[in-house]
Amino acid sequence: MSDLKHLTGLCNIPASNITSILDMAAGYKKKLITPCPSFEPSLQNKRIALVFFENSTRTRFSFEIAARHLGAGTLNFSASSSSVSKGESLSDTIKNLEAMQVDAFVLRHPSSGAADLITRITSKNVINAGDGSHEHPTQALLDMFTLREYFGTIDGLKVIIIGDVLHSRVARSNIYGLITAGAEVGICCPVTLMPPDADQLGITLFTDLDRAIAWADTAIVLRLQLERATGGYLPSLEEYSVHYGLTDERLERVQKHLLVLHPGPINREIEIANNVADRIQPPGYSKSMLLEQVTNGVAVRMAVLNTLLTL
């Protein structure tokens, strides 16, 4: 049983809730990687609405797989084929789905704060699957799970987040969650992509990637939204790649072995080189956890669904 009704972000969430979710996910992961995984149908007869106003591959499919492993049914909502295309508001959409007796909402929306909004108009559980540049809590939880599984603990780890931190909901949730779990967090990006409140977040700030890598135990590389190059934030994608792209040459120069995470999708040869993204074993100065993160995402989202829906 849990006292957690919604998961709209990791800001102010107690460490005990994070630990409980990660511990539960560890149990699910052990079964997931067996040839024929079988789980207790703890969410049998539950109906979960996957309400995605933005495209998604990993998040939407992993929530759907997670729900089915636990015995729940899913309703897949597409904004383009719904009454939203006729002008229906988010509030009316949620109220109508609730009237169909769904038990929970998993929401992805382009507007920051959308998930918090619907917690005020529904009595059902709400899980934020990414809202604008606000938060993406389950991505951060799966990143934290990946780090804990590899290092044994998050406490004391130095984690550098590289890229467009200003617009990144993944960065926000990771900063909040990792600090709560005892990690030291740094961010590395051009000053044009530095959040205005960065110096109030309790993190270390870098604009030089070599220095950031030398400081860190592990790196979370963010997807560069390609429109930033034409929006005045960057001179060009090529220049960004030269100064902030994670490459073997840079790691060798700094002489640093680094565990590398990325939330996906990746822009190959822009924020991360092919060989860094794909290397899962030595030789080399990096170890990629990108596909391991995807596997862990199912386990973590199972834990989140079970935690919230078995109150």
Curated annotation (Swiss-Prot):
Pathway: Pyrimidine metabolism; UMP biosynthesis via de novo pathway; (S)-dihydroorotate from bicarbonate: step 2/3. It catalyses: carbamoyl phosphate + L-aspartate = N-carbamoyl-L-aspartate + phosphate + H(+). It is an enzyme of class 2 (transferase). Carbamoyl phosphate binds at R58, T59, R108, H136, Q139, G264, P265. One of its GO terms (biological process) is 'de novo' pyrimidine nucleobase biosynthetic process. GO terms for cellular component: cytosol. Keywords: Pyrimidine biosynthesis, Transferase. L-aspartate binds at K86, R169, R223. InterPro entries: Asp/Orn_carbamoyltranf_P-bd, Asp/Orn_carbamoylTrfase, Asp/Orn_carbamoylTrfase_sf, Asp_carbamoyltransf, Asp_carbamoyltransf_Asp/Orn-bd. Its EC number is 2.1.3.2. The keyword Transferase applies. One of its GO terms (molecular function) is amino acid binding. NCBIfam families: asp_carb_tr (TIGR00670), PRK00856.1 (NF002032). Heterododecamer (2C3:3R2) of six catalytic PyrB chains organized as two trimers (C3), and six regulatory PyrI chains organized as three dimers (R2). Belongs to the aspartate/ornithine carbamoyltransferase superfamily. ATCase family. Catalyzes the condensation of carbamoyl phosphate and aspartate to form carbamoyl aspartate and inorganic phosphate, the committed step in the de novo pyrimidine nucleotide biosynthesis pathway. This is Aspartate carbamoyltransferase catalytic subunit. The gene is pyrB.
